[in-house]
Amino acid sequence: MDAALLLNVEGVKKTILHGGTGELPNFITGSRVIFHFRTMKCDEERTVIDDSRQVGQPMHIIIGNMFKLEVWEILLTSMRVHEVAEFWCDTIHTGVYPILSRSLRQMAQGKDPTEWHVHTCGLANMFAYHTLGYEDLDELQKEPQPLVFVIELLQVDAPSDYQRETWNLSNHEKMKAVPVLHGEGNRLFKLGRYEEASSKYQEAIICLRNLQTKEKPWEVQWLKLEKMINTLILNYCQCLLKKEEYYEVLEHTSDILRHHPGIVKAYYVRARAHAEVWNEAEAKADLRKVLELEPSMQKAVRRELRLLENRMAEKQEEERLRCRNMLSQGATQPPAEPPTEPPAQSSTEPPAEPPPAPSAELSAGPPAETATEPPPSPGHSLQH
């Protein structure tokens, strides 16, 4: 084991446990660094707090992406590939570790939709919690202390060597990606590839949501991003209509209207979803609101009202036929015979069983759905 090596950083001490190979990698901005780590206390037992090998997958961070535990970027950029080193880090560098650890543990347990990595937006809301949900982490948060990190550097990928996920992009790259994703979603929608289109819209929404967390709510830039997000959500909802996921459409559109009650397209899309699940009164109320806010949409509203009327008539006819079938089934069943006294039996014969009562089949499936005209394609009055 080499003697302790001091990095040019206050409160950090490094000891190389196993030498690496080759030259020091070129850690340029956007490089992906893959590594295993073990975090320990500085007590006599060297109590293990976290160990990525126990999770079964290595961790990775992106250089220059404002990783919350900034000291890790400093530690990793001092290492060669396959090097194993131990780093002692003073309290000035470890105060945020309990919050990071909580996020890592939740991901390992499958509670977070992302994989075994951490990024800024995933940590932004952690400070709102009074407890982290883990006793050892609560203790660390109340009483920050120096920690030891044992790190094995596995791989360093240049930005051009891997496909960067949306969250890996810089703020500028995210903003540039949004119109590209939006346009690709519109193209796929027109081709009838609704699943792929919805994925593009979702990816663009994630970019904008991440950018929005960096702005002060309800100020100019925040509202600009909010408008873009709502447009994309409504495009996404049109994909959901095509996929017959009507209740999710109702959820998204209602959420938009709770915060922005003047968005005409949200009322229109919600009206169509209400119509598909036979919420006649709600659909008509939303269509009236569309006309109130945008009289020029009278033609589209009349068309939706006709479709709604036809849909409700079909449903009523289906219900009428179902009731008639149930009544006719009951009429064809033989009447139950009146009970009679059983004949005298000897003590050795068992008593006669009573005849089973006739039963009518009462269960029925949901009413059949009716076809609807497709929504205006992206790029027209309902989609930007």
Curated annotation (Swiss-Prot):
Keywords: Cytoplasm, Nucleus, Repeat, TPR repeat. Residues 359-372 have a biased composition (Low complexity). Interacts with NUB1. PROSITE patterns: TPR_REGION. SUPFAM superfamilies: FKBP-like, TPR-like. This is Aryl-hydrocarbon-interacting protein-like 1. Residues 328-384 are annotated as: Disordered. GO terms for molecular function: peptidyl-prolyl cis-trans isomerase activity. Pfam families: PPIase_AIP. Disulfide bonds: none annotated. Its main location: cytoplasm. May be important in protein trafficking and/or protein folding and stabilization. The keyword Translocase does not apply. It is found in: Cytoplasm; Nucleus. Residues 53-145 form the PPIase FKBP-type domain. GO terms for cellular component: cytoplasm; nucleus. It comes from Pan paniscus (Pygmy chimpanzee). Gene3D superfamilies: 3.10.50.40, Tetratricopeptide repeat domain.
